[in-house]
């Protein structure tokens, strides 16, 4: 079809050029004839003038000029009708030629149109119409959200004439794997008439869609009878209804046709939209997960706050094992005391409590066990308060520890004054100020060997209890402010210095007492110790009631905090 149209266009252009050439030649010939006529008339006028000049040379100049002028006017009068007649003839001829040329052009165009129509008619008669004209293609593709695969069968009529080729698709279920390259591309054109789509559902849940696509200017055999008027309207330019139907059909094809034959197959917008929806759902899930995490993160500080409130009166998890180990080294009688003391300790002093729990050395375990049976209850209450008497505010801790420290130092000073005779003042100063624990233990054991029976048990309690008290007091003092420690040490050294000065003065006054003291040191030591211990037991029995009441109040407070 395109070749015939091109040849007709070329022929028409050649005819037009030929007509233009003819017109140009005619116009040139007319011009030449006009020039020839004008030249001939000019020559005749010149001859007449020459003749008149020769004949009337005798006359005067003025008369000659007048006659010559008259002759010229006559010649002009004779020439003008001839020239006017020639111009009129040429114009008439040219007008007739143009009219003929226009008529020829119209005739040629009519012939070309008739030839094109005859060629189209021949082509339509040569190709008999059939229902299977064009390519029949069926695709099965799973659509998300449907119960089963949807079968899409499409019927297209291709412009170029050729053999009918059918590509049967897989009718049973979706394809398990891509079968080679994709099929030939489908040429989908706009629909020329509204044809309702046929939706059929099989027993297996498959939906078959059979849209029919018809190209503009062509029709099927069955539809030709029904839609002749519609097709004529579409050929003339179409109506608003047909345009709306085309747009609707385009959208329907985009949403219905799905190509999933292979990895390289085409995908329509209908698949992309569910993917976007899936991405949106994933994003929503991520947002929900983030919100849950944020809620859990928000819940963590609340839990931490509750843990902090509880841990102010309890022990964190990290040091549970250490505290259990430290409790395992402590005898059974003191386990409950240690646990209660640890429950009342705030965070800042947990390490101090663990150190105070680990005070008991391996070598002194037996002594501590012995001391449990013989320690007076006053000293046990002091130990309990030194360990479990730590409250939230450090002021109460400082006050109680100062009271414990002062009581312990007073008891030690009293014992040292009762134990040490005048002859051993230098040794007592060393033992009280900077004597190591080993020497104290040796001295106390040597002193303990003097007495017998129940006095030996009391001495063993004294041997073990002062060590534990001293170590616990020292490590509990580490939690107290450094300024208070320095003040307490200064006070203890001042007291010791005053006692030493008094003893030196007594020694200077009575030098004979030194010798007596050297002889009777051993006996005096035992007697003084027994007296001091009895006095301390009496004082302890007096203060039992008050300290037991205080300990009971502290235990009740710790139980409330643990709850």
UniProtKB/Swiss-Prot annotation:
Segments of skewed composition (Low complexity): 384-395
Localization per Swiss-Prot or TrEMBL: Membrane
Annotated spans, Disordered: 56-81, 311-563
Transmembrane segments: 3-23, 99-119
Membrane topology: Multi-pass membrane protein
Disulfide bonds: none
Keywords from the named record: Membrane, Transmembrane, Transmembrane helix
Gene Ontology cellular component list: membrane; nucleus
Superkingdom field: Eukaryota
UniProt biased composition (Basic and acidic residues): 69-79, 367-383, 412-447, 485-544
InterPro entries in UniProt: TSBP1 (IPR038754)
Protein name: Testis-expressed basic protein 1
């Amino acid at each position: 079809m395109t070749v015939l149209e091109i040849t007709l266009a070329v022929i028409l252009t050649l005819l037009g050029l030929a007509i233009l050439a003819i017109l140009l030649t005619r116009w040139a010939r007319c011009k030449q004839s006009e020039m020839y006529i004008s030249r001939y008339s000019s020559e005749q006028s010149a001859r007449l003038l020459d003749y008149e000049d020769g004949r009337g040379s005798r006359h005067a100049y003025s008369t000659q000029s007048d006659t010559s002028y008259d002759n010229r006017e006559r010649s002009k009068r004779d020439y003008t009708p001839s020239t006017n007649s020639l111009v009129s003839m040429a114009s008439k001829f040219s007008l007739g030629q143009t009219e003929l040329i226009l008529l020829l052009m119209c005739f040629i165009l009519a012939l070309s149109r008739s030839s094109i129509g005859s060629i189209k008619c021949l082509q339509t008669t040569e190709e008999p119409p059939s229902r299977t004209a064009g390519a029949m293609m069926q695709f099965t593709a799973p659509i998300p959200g449907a119960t089963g695969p949807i079968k899409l069968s499409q019927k297209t009529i291709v412009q170029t004439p050729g053999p009918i080729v059918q590509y049967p698709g897989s009718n049973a279920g979706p394809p398990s794997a891509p079968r080679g390259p994709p099929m030939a591309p489908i040429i989908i054109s706009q629909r020329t008439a509204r044809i309702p789509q046929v939706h059929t559902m099989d027993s297996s849940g498959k939906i078959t869609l059979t849209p029919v696509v018809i190209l503009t200017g062509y029709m099927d055999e069955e539809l030709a009878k029904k839609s002749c008027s519609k097709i004529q309207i579409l050929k003339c330019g179409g109506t608003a209804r047909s345009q709306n139907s085309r747009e609707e059909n385009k959208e329907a094809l985009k949403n219905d046709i799905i190509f999933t034959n292979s990895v390289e197959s085409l995908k329509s917008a209908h698949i992309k939209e569910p993917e976007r929806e899936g991405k949106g759902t994933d994003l929503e899930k991520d947002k929900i997960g983030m919100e849950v995490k944020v809620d859990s993160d928000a819940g963590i500080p609340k839990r931490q706050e509750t843990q902090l409130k509880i841990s102010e009166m309890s022990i964190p998890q990290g040091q549970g094992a250490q505290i259990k180990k430290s409790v395992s080294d402590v005898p059974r009688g003191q386990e409950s005391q240690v646990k209660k003391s640890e429950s009342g300790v705030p965070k800042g002093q947990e390490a101090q409590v663990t150190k105070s729990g680990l005070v008991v050395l391996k070598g002194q375990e037996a002594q501590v066990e012995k001391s449990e049976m013989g320690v007076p209850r006053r000293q046990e209450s002091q130990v309990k308060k030194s360990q479990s008497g730590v409250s939230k505010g450090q002021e109460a801790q400082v006050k109680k520890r100062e009271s414990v420290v002062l009581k312990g130092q007073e008891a030690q000073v009293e014992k040292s004054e009762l134990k040490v005779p005048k002859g051993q003042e230098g040794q007592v100063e060393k033992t009280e100020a900077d004597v190591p624990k080993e020497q104290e233990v040796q001295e106390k054991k040597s002193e303990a060997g003097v007495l017998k029976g129940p006095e030996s048990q009391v001495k063993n309690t004294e041997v073990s209890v002062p060590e534990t008290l001293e170590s616990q007091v020292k490590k509990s003092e580490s939690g107290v402010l450094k300024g208070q420690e320095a003040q307490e040490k200064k006070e203890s050294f001042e007291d010791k210095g005053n006692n030493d000065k008094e003893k030196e003065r007594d020694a200077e006054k009575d030098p004979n007492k030194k010798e007596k003291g050297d002889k009777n040191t051993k006996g005096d030591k035992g007697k003084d110790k027994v007296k001091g211990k009895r006095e301390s037991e009496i004082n302890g029995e007096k203060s039992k009631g008050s300290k037991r009441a205080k300990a009971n109040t502290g235990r009740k407070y710790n139980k409330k905090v643990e709850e």
